Amino acid sequence: MGGSALNQGVLEGDDAPGQSLYERLSQRMLDISGDRGVLKDVIREGAGDLVAPDASVLVKYSGYLEHMDRPFDSNYFRKTPRLMKLGEDITLWGMELGLLSMRRGELARFLFKPNYAYGTLGCPPLIPPNTTVLFEIELLDFLDCAESDKFCALSAEQQDQFPLQKVLKVAATEREFGNYLFRQNRFYDAKVRYKRALLLLRRRSAPPEEQHLVEAAKLPVLLNLSFTYLKLDRPTIALCYGEQALIIDQKNAKALFRCGQACLLLTEYQKARDFLVRAQKEQPFNHDINNELKKLASCYRDYVDKEKEMWHRMFAPCGDGSTAGES
């Protein structure tokens, strides 16, 4: 998103004497505030639901002053944008309103009048007083965590009053939140979200004909927990969650792989080999599984060599020619 593209391409053919760049641009934009304080032009359509009022959003944005090629504010150069909660983390009222009009994957251009941006005073020296600003915003994703927070605060009895689909939806949101935190390397926080999802699914009583839906939702959460505990250097707990996943699907290659990784860290080499060979049987050409088997072989060779050296030292003759145990 560059200012050069904005200034050169957006307004071609729309020149009008005496009108500024933003005035000409505003003529083709949609009024979403009701007073033309926030105007919108969709560059790329999104899909799915609109952003919920209490959602946490993952966005990329760049803010421009009129006739400036470079943004005065942008997070486009960050590898991973920060998750921001509506009503708390977003300081521009215009951006808040704009996001509420967007769907996942949407890219849009907005004009914010001063009362929806930096006010009559601006933000010296960067933003002059009474300045209209342009923002290009891409909505990567959003999580309606407020709904799940409220649901998780209910008692088990209250949660049972809701249909199963509601529980599955909330659990999926918790898992998505955990996945985001995991990608940020915030493993402890991710673990908390995964555990919340698992608790919801475990305490949900479902009729036999719907139990398979609960088990299907549990499986990826258990796999996430196993991987997260490996990242937290807690292989015993990682193994526990991996084995729980295998109860649901005994041939699941990812669960077998996680169990093998955990056993290798615990130096339980035979168990590690058993799990990894079973995983390889399910996915013979999986690069990660095959590499882990090579790593296991190397670790086991080192272990055997160290054992031999230890026993050799224990039974080696003493320096004066006497053997261990001689008086």
From Swiss-Prot:
It is found in: Cytoplasm; Nucleus. Keywords: Cytoplasm, Differentiation, Disease variant, Meiosis, Nucleus, Repeat, RNA-mediated gene silencing, Spermatogenesis, TPR repeat, Williams-Beuren syndrome. The keyword Nucleus applies. GO terms for cellular component: cytoplasm; cytosol; fibrillar center; intercellular bridge; microtubule cytoskeleton; synaptonemal complex. Residues 54-143 form the PPIase FKBP-type domain. GO terms for biological process: cell differentiation; meiotic cell cycle; piRNA processing; positive regulation of viral genome replication; protein folding; regulatory ncRNA-mediated gene silencing; spermatogenesis; transposable element silencing by piRNA-mediated DNA methylation. Gene3D superfamilies: 3.10.50.40, Tetratricopeptide repeat domain. TPR repeats lie at residues 171-204, 219-252, 253-286. It comes from the Eukaryota. Its main location: cytoplasm. InterPro entries: FKBP6/shu, PPIase_dom_sf, PPIase_FKBP_dom, TPR-like_helical_dom_sf, TPR_rpt. Detected in all tissues examined, with higher expression in testis, heart, skeletal muscle, liver, and kidney. GO terms for molecular function: FK506 binding; Hsp90 protein binding; identical protein binding. Belongs to the FKBP6 family. It is linked to FKBP6 is located in the Williams-Beuren syndrome (WBS) critical region. WBS results from a hemizygous deletion of several genes on chromosome 7q11.23, thought to arise as a consequence of unequal crossing over between highly homologous low-copy repeat sequences flanking the deleted region. Haploinsufficiency of FKBP6 may be the cause of certain cardiovascular and musculo-skeletal abnormalities observed in the disease. A father and son with Williams-Beuren syndrome appear to have a common heterozygous deletion that includes FKBP6 gene. Spermatogenic failure 77: An autosomal recessive male infertility disorder characterized by oligozoospermia or azoospermia, and abnormally shaped spermatozoa in the semen of affected individuals. Sperm abnormalities include double and triple tails, with amorphous or fragmented and enlarged heads, as well as pinhead sperm. Testicular tissue shows arrest at the round spermatid stage. Has an essential role in spermatogenesis. It is required to repress transposable elements and prevent their mobilization, which is essential for the germline integrity. Acts via the piRNA metabolic process, which mediates the repression of transposable elements during meiosis by forming complexes composed of piRNAs and Piwi proteins and govern the methylation and subsequent repression of transposons. Acts as a co-chaperone via its interaction with HSP90 and is required for the piRNA amplification process, the secondary piRNA biogenesis. Interacts (via TPR repeats) with HSP90. Interacts with HSP72/HSPA2 and CLTC. Interacts with GAPDH; leading to inhibit GAPDH catalytic activity. This is Inactive peptidyl-prolyl cis-trans isomerase FKBP6. It comes from Homo sapiens. The gene is FKBP6.
